Amino acid sequence: MADREEALREFVAVTGAEEERARFFLESAGWDLQIALASFYEDGGDEDILTLPQPTPSSVSRGTAASDHRVTSFRDLVHAQEDDDEEEEGQRFYAGGSERSGQQIVGPPRKKSPNELVEDLFKGAKEHGAVAVDRTAKSSGESSKPKPFAGGGYRLGATPEEESAYVAGERRHNSVQDVHVVLKLWKTGFSLDSGELRSYQDPSNAQFLDDIRRGEVPAELRRLARGGQVNLDMEDHRDEEYVKPKSVFKAFTGEGQKLGSTAPQVLSTSSPAQQAENEAKASSAIAIDESEPVTNIQIRLADGGRLVQKFNHNHRIRDIRLFIVDARPAMAATSFVLMTTFPNKELTDENQTLKEANLLNAVIVQRLT
């Protein structure tokens, strides 16, 4: 009974649980303190339990003549671990200490607040050579610094008789480029330049933050530079919530070649009266058998116009093509295809009837090729 009371007191001292709750776990474990503690922390879901290995008899501390105690106290075990980093390993508890064995319970690591994490990042960067820069002075200095011209040109002759000579410009390897990145440290995460917020707690960002803390350039930034120099600025926004910056339009500054249009613009030279006359002729050219089923087909033209024509169900898709050419004679020399809208599909077999192609009362779009 005395052993059970001792186990109950140690359980309460280690876990801080109420006596009734402690008794429940001990009774469930058959009054085995180690099993009860393990069950308690598994129920909590956070704590890890580590059992210290049994030392050999030669490593056991022997008492002096002045003291006949052969049991290591909690105070001795705690003092032996004072040099450990409690912030990294979590709070330690000891239970069941004896001459030859002991149980050490290590709580979960204390998570750092975002403010502490940002402070550590700046501290680590400064320890590895980073310097604080005045943002206003930096921006004004960068804008006023002239950039030398690195292109080619012609050196003019000093006299009329002296010929001009072409001078080649500086060659730069396209594969090597300098990269300037701004790392913004916010209240709940960080962002790169105008990118999305990345959480401090996301495991996929742990390596990136560790590299910054060690004063190293993260691998993802080195890949951007392709062997060039990476200039990294860190901005402290730890007291601010992340605000997504407004997207800024950036004009294309690269090089390219102007290609010919694959879809030449169709210019209609017909007057409105002439166009109406052409549409009337095209409509009359479609022979409609009133004794057979009829359907209306709406045609959206590539020039923005719209035609609506009545067809029999046994008319074919090629009849629609001929109708378009008759209504818009300028398209006779233009290559185009006919497509459905929903689903968007090209009508490749123009020998199909409208009924076979499921085009009854459909909308057809003309697309230039």
From Swiss-Prot:
Residues 46-115, 133-156, 260-280 are annotated as: Disordered. Its main location: nucleus. The gene is NSFL1C. GO terms for cellular component: centrosome; cytosol; Golgi stack; nucleus; VCP-NSFL1C complex. This is NSFL1 cofactor p47. Residues 291-367 form the UBX domain. Gene3D superfamilies: DNA helicase RuvA subunit, C-terminal domain (1.10.8.10), Phosphatidylinositol 3-kinase Catalytic Subunit, Chain A, domain 1 (3.10.20.90), SEP domain (3.30.420.210). The lineage of its organism: Eukaryota, Metazoa, Chordata, Craniata, Vertebrata. Residues 67-81 have a biased composition (Basic and acidic residues). InterPro entries: NSFL1C_SEP_dom_sf, SEP_domain, UBA-like_sf, Ubiquitin-like_domsf, UBX_dom. Belongs to the NSFL1C family. It comes from the Eukaryota. Residues 260-277 have a biased composition (Polar residues). It is found in: Nucleus; Golgi apparatus, Golgi stack; Cytoplasm, Cytoskeleton, Microtubule organizing center, Centrosome. It holds the Pfam family UBA_4. The keyword Cytoplasm applies. It comes from Gallus gallus. Reduces the ATPase activity of VCP. Necessary for the fragmentation of Golgi stacks during mitosis and for VCP-mediated reassembly of Golgi stacks after mitosis. May play a role in VCP-mediated formation of transitional endoplasmic reticulum (tER). Inhibits the activity of CTSL (in vitro). Together with UBXN2B/p37, regulates the centrosomal levels of kinase AURKA/Aurora A levels during mitotic progression by promoting AURKA removal from centrosomes in prophase. Also, regulates spindle orientation during mitosis. A motif (Nuclear localization signal) lies at residues 109-115, 172-175. SMART domains: SEP, UBX. Residues 178-243 form the SEP domain. GO terms for biological process: autophagosome assembly; establishment of mitotic spindle orientation; Golgi organization; membrane fusion; negative regulation of protein localization to centrosome; nuclear membrane reassembly; positive regulation of mitotic centrosome separation; proteasome-mediated ubiquitin-dependent protein catabolic process. Keywords: Cytoplasm, Cytoskeleton, Golgi apparatus, Lipid-binding, Nucleus. GO terms for molecular function: lipid binding; ubiquitin binding.
